[in-house]
Amino acid sequence: MYTIDNRNTTENLLQFLAASPSPFHAVEQAAKKLTEAGFLPLQECEKWDLVPGRGYFVTRNNSSIIAFAIPKKPAPSLMLTASHTDSPTYKLKDKAEMDTFGKYTRLATECYGGMLIW
């Protein structure tokens, strides 16, 4: 049975988020993690020679990344997961700086994209 080390998983996620202040950084970090896991980068405008049992990834404009693995044996189905790096997020408003009683500065933000806020 597959088990997850929650503490390690959480620490890895927090490190990834800290290293990814923008969508571009997130794509860079994802490519780094994929490379460390043995995935090979592909160029989208070149012919691909894909080998069963290998993983690959493609980036575009340093702002999007797609990763996939070719199974060693033909699979009866396809497993797919997707996400994006640009939304939801908080964006700074125009004239974002707000002085708070001379004690500290706050930044006015707005939600960009659909987000669940509890």
Explain the meaning of each model-derived region.
Residues 1-118:
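N-terminal hydrophobic/helix-forming segments and targeting peptides
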